[in-house]
């Protein structure tokens, strides 16, 4: 498998690679289900609902539109509030198009500049917030009318309610796409946003600011790290608070900041957030557990030293809890992925996983869990086999990992088949040593000429599955299967054939009368 096309493709996503099939793996785009799931869509854009008893209108009629162009301040505030309320209610998609078609967006942007009317600024910012929460086309309208620069300026408003609403508006704009995010960053929004996270800020401001920060840090292509890493000190303070929503947004920001090079990972480590992240990985709320766990998972894709930092902070007992508990599929999958990157490390790190009693939980998931979870559990075990010592591999065999690995040889995921095949090959190699005279004293087992791991694979119906892979369309899988069969079973078949030949005999009484080309043996033996 080394040097093969399959592994070269897989390795392109690694942070580091160990010999064999294993290696630390960055999260692949097709693995990131939660980024496409509905529960995270709420992170990207949020529409603010109407306050109780807000003045409202039944529809956007011409009279209401004309009021927006009035010179009377009180009438402007009332009309803007009514339109904003329409944008908070039902039929949002219809209402936002009506507002845009009526040409009201540039008027709302103009109201943002009226510093002598903070109430009008607030209502206009709220209306723009909800417009930007719509489609990408809706967001583009807000951007195209110059709202971003003015919103960033309003982060310095003396009025808390205005600043908080502006933070929300910028969060919706930056959450639309990487291009919109970069426009907001390009207007130097981040430094002013970080100023909102002071000790006197209300919880609602902290929550909104953390959410907007997460949107400024997310997306592919990623934002310039030297720009967004300025948020790390603030995030390190926010993560020490207790509000569930605030913690979730803060952890998501850390997910995005830790997703990348070892230099990025090191910056997150140096922000002193890892111990708190590990504690949050067993939080009561899945909305906090998921991003906390994913950040930990990102960190252990780094080098051995960075991975060891997480181990030293006692992450493994938390991971055992997540693997054994009744958590949702996403959390169990994330936990397995995290462990797989730890078992891709050095042998002492593999041993730390063993000592934490994680292997039984992995084997259980490998046998009984859903496909995605099973795949990550397989990677965790196969990485340990790839980089483990013979003694460590023997330990995994005793944990009964062979049968579930054999069962995966028939799955449709060619990368996973290859990984399991390589793991079984390593197991067979260890079994060969085990059966040789050199094994005596190492495993303290009786000497035998039989490869016990080959027997276990046969009992698990693995031999017939490996034989079936000789017709696999993937050339690497085919070649590896053939090599395994030639190395560990062909010789056995030859020995059996020889034994059968040795069993052919003639009765002793008739031996002298055995016919030959020159007569019987007795005749050939008689002399003159």
Swiss-Prot record:
Classify the main location: nucleus
Q: Which domain of life is it from?
A: Eukaryota
Q: Where are the ARM repeats?
A: 93-133, 136-175, 178-218, 220-259, 262-301, 304-344, 347-386, 390-429
Q: Name one GO biological process term.
A: protein import into nucleus
- Which residues are in the IBB domain? 1-56
Citing just one GO molecular function, the answer is:
nuclear import signal receptor activity
The protein's job, in short, is: Binds to conventional NLS motifs and mediates nuclear protein import across the nuclear envelope. Acts as a cellular receptor for the nuclear import of the virD2 protein of Agrobacterium, but is not essential for Agrobacterium-mediated root transformation.
Name assigned to this protein: Importin subunit alpha-7
Q: Which organism is it from?
A: Arabidopsis thaliana (Mouse-ear cress)
């Amino acid at each position: 498998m080394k040097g093969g096309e399959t592994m070269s493709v897989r390795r392109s996503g690694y942070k580091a690679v160990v010999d064999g099939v294993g290696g630390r793996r960055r999260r692949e785009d097709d693995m990131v289900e939660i980024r496409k799931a509905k529960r995270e869509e709420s992170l990207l854009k949020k529409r603010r609902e109407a306050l109780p008893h807000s003045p409202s209108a039944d529809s956007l009629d011409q009279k209401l539109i004309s009021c927006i162009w009035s010179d009377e301040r009180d009438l402007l505030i009332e009309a803007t509030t009514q339109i904003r309320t329409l944008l908070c209610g039902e039929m949002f998609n219809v209402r936002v198009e009506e507002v845009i078609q009526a040409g009201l967006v540039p008027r709302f942007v103009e109201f943002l500049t009226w510093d002598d009317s903070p109430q009008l600024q607030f209502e206009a910012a709220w209306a723009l917030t909800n417009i930007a929460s719509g489609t990408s086309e809706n967001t583009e309208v807000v951007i195209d009318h110059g709202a971003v620069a003015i919103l960033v300026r309003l982060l310095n408003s003396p009025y808390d309610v205005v600043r908080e609403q502006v933070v929300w508006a910028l969060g919706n704009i930056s959450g639309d796409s990487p291009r919109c995010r970069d426009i907001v960053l390009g207007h130097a929004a981040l430094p002013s946003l970080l100023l909102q996270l002071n000790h006197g800020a209300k919880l609602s401001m902290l929550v909104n600011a953390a959410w907007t920060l997460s949107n400024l840090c997310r997306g592919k292509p990623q934002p310039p790290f030297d720009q967004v890493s300025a948020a790390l000190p603030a995030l390190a303070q926010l993560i020490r608070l207790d509000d569930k929503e605030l913690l979730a947004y803060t952890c998501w920001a850390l997910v995005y900041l830790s997703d990348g090079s070892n230099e990025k990972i090191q910056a997150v480590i140096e922000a002193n957030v890892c111990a708190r992240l590990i504690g949050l990985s067993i939080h009561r709320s899945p909305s906090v557990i998921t991003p906390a766990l994913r950040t930990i998972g990102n960190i252990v894709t780094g080098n051995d030293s960075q991975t060891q930092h997480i181990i030293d902070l006692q992450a493994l007992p938390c991971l055992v809890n997540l693997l054994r508990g009744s958590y949702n599929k996403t959390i169990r999958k994330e936990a397995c992925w995290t462990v797989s990157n730890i078992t891709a490390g050095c042998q002492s790190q593999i041993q730390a996983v063993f000592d934490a009693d994680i292997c039984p939980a992995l084997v259980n998931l490998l046998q009984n869990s859903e496909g995605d979870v099973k795949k990550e559990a397989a990677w965790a075990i196969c990485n340990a086999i790839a980089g483990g010592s013979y003694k460590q591999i023997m330990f995994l065999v005793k944990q009964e990992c062979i049968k579930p690995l054999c069962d995966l040889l028939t799955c449709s995921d060619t990368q996973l088949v290859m990984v399991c095949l390589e793991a079984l090959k390593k197991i067979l190699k260890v079994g060969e040593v085990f059966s040789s005279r050199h094994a005596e004293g190492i495993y303290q087992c009786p000497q035998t000429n039989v490869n016990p791991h080959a027997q276990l694979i046969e009992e698990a119906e693995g031999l017939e599955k490996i034989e079936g892979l000789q017709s696999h369309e993937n050339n690497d899988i085919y070649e590896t299967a053939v090599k395994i069969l030639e190395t560990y079973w062909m010789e056995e078949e030859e020995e059996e054939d020889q034994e059968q030949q040795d069993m052919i005999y003639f009765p002793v009484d008739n031996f002298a009368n055995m016919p030959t080309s020159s007569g019987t043996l007795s005749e050939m033996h008689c002399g003159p």
